[in-house]
Amino acid sequence: PLVSATTAISHELGRPLNGLLVRKEAKDHGTGQFVEGLGNFKPGDKVAMLEDVVTTGGSLLKACDRVRAAGLDIVAVCCILDREEGGREKLKEAGYELHSLFTRKELVEMARS
């Protein structure tokens, strides 16, 4: 939903962005690909990874691996919520800086105020 909304809004604003969907499991129907939407990109294109919630970072790292294996250059890794359960550190070890809109601590503090 995040990627679909982002690409739709970008087109409405006249600054179109293409999007990819990275699956946890390849489907046994359709294209059967882990990464959908590659036809909109060429090798070496720069992409940003967008995730709703990062916990340990494992799923996001796997998605990054699949996108890089497809020949794309990841220039940003972003999420809405970093649950602060090791994901940021794990991503940093892999060479990615995580940009989050909120951390768990920030949301808890806002809820208490």
Placement of each model-derived feature along the sequence:
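Short, glycine/charge-rich flexible loops or terminal/linker lids adjacent to PRPP-binding catalytic cores
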Residues: 3-48, 58-61
